[in-house]
Amino acid sequence: MESRSDDMKQQRHDVVIVGGGAAGLSGALTLARARRSVLVIDAGKPRNAPASHIHNYLGRESTPPGELLAIGRGEAAGYGAEIVEGRVASAERLPGEQGFRVATEDGRSVEARRLLVTTGLVDELPPVPGLAERWGREVLHCPYCHGHEVADRPIGVLATGGFAVHQALMWRQWSEDVTLFRHTGPEPTDAEYEELAARGVAVVDGEVTGLEVADDRFTGVRLAGGPVIPREALVVQARFVARSAVLESLGLVPVAQEMGGEVIGTYIPTDPTGATEVPGVWAAGNVTRLTEQVIGAAAAGLMAAGAINGDLIAEDTRNAVEARRRG
């Protein structure tokens, strides 16, 4: 993998970044350009790996996810950032103001003055056979990420909660042929039925038991009892679970995020710059903002990196003043 190795060249850095996606690499690029020593530890398991292209990224529209990461690694490494492959198991604060020690699952450790955690999230899909295999291809959740690519095609929406009606009405913007499959979701209210009917969204009762696939293409939804409803895309509500183990090892606790009165996942709270409740620790990207797209995650990495550099400058200045006073 370009600009990555298994070896850590030094054992202490200004900043260790856990996670090498858009947020982490953006933070690494910013900090390296600020002449900070930066180490990125990346497990190589990006959330958007199943997707064929990235969208809504100005200047990089329709870039394959792997290509964007390779470009980002090269850019960050070009300014001196070190990028290694590995999975971080935990982090701990060192005594005094010495920073943190980060431990990987394979037994390596490294120290840092500051931490930036950009570990993203995991999409937990409804327990319907076939969803995971088609995830990111024809099984979708974000209309802004995938809507244009399935425009004017037959689209299904799998209801597992009350948010499905909102999803169906939203995806109607991209296709006139939208069907809401009731599945295990609640029955729509009278007002919701009226809205769906007004927009021409069909509602089908019955549990979905699987997907029909032919020639490696999703072709329809199979209902209990055998009927198959032809569809070319299926929208689901995944549960977004922050990859927060590293942050939890430092004492941070993930909280539930609600949308439309439903819990859609968990995240780690931060301030607008990405600072967590643990001094010296920042988080950026989907681990703290569940609905962030790639370009937003990159922007969050930049924001956090700027705040981290400012914090380090303040510490460097305090240390310089103390040294001057000591003569």
Predicted feature locations:
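Beta1-alpha1 glycine-rich phosphate/pyrophosphate-binding loop at the start
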Residues: 13-70, 153-154, 163-187
